[in-house]
Amino acid sequence: MKRKIIITLVLCILALSCASAGRFSIKAQFSPYSLQSIAIESGNYYSSYGFDFKAGARYNIWDRLDVGLDISLNNYRYKDFDTSYLVIGFKAKVGYGFDFTEKIFGQAEMGLGLDIRKVEDRSQATFGFGIYMGGGYRFTDRISATAGVDIEYGFQNGKSANSTDFAANLQLGAIIGL
């Protein structure tokens, strides 16, 4: 069901980009070292580190206002245990960009979504909120390089305990306009 909803949203964005004067682009970001901390209601606190990769589609709806969808893949390893876990995330985002010069720009994005955390044989769903702030250099009208800071917060209401997580990382990426 979730897969059908995501595919439908992506197809709607593609249809809108073909039907109007707006602009459609693909954005990919990577962080080789991401830090995350998890606090569990029972008082336990865990720190982890790993990589973060995001890919998504953006649609320019007005001036520099964009809407988009991101899919992220994170692999974290607990610092205190010999255990790693995989996080797959889906976020709907709204962003705004501004130009400093013809080639240099800034951008800010805010997103809401769902993170699915796979720890050993268990899967956990976490509601997530994220903010990205950064900028970039426009090589051509269609190709840009970006760098920025991505901060994410998640909350999970589990069967045994509630947990919150906080992640921060430096993202390097590219935008390709279609």
Identify what each model region corresponds to:
Residues 81-105:
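Helix-adjacent hinge/juxtasegments
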Residues 21, 60-64, 99-103, 138-144:
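Outer-membrane beta-barrel channels and translocator barrels
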Residues 31-41, 72-81, 99-101, 113-121, ...:
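Sequence/structural signature of outer-membrane beta-barrel proteins
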Residues 18-79, 165-178:
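Short glycine/proline- and aromatic-enriched beta-strand/turn motifs that initiate or cap beta-hairpins
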Residues 1-25:
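Cleavable N-terminal export/targeting peptides
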Residues 30-32, 53-59, 71-73, 90-96, ...:
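Residues on the lipid-exposed face of transmembrane beta-strands in outer-membrane beta-barrel proteins
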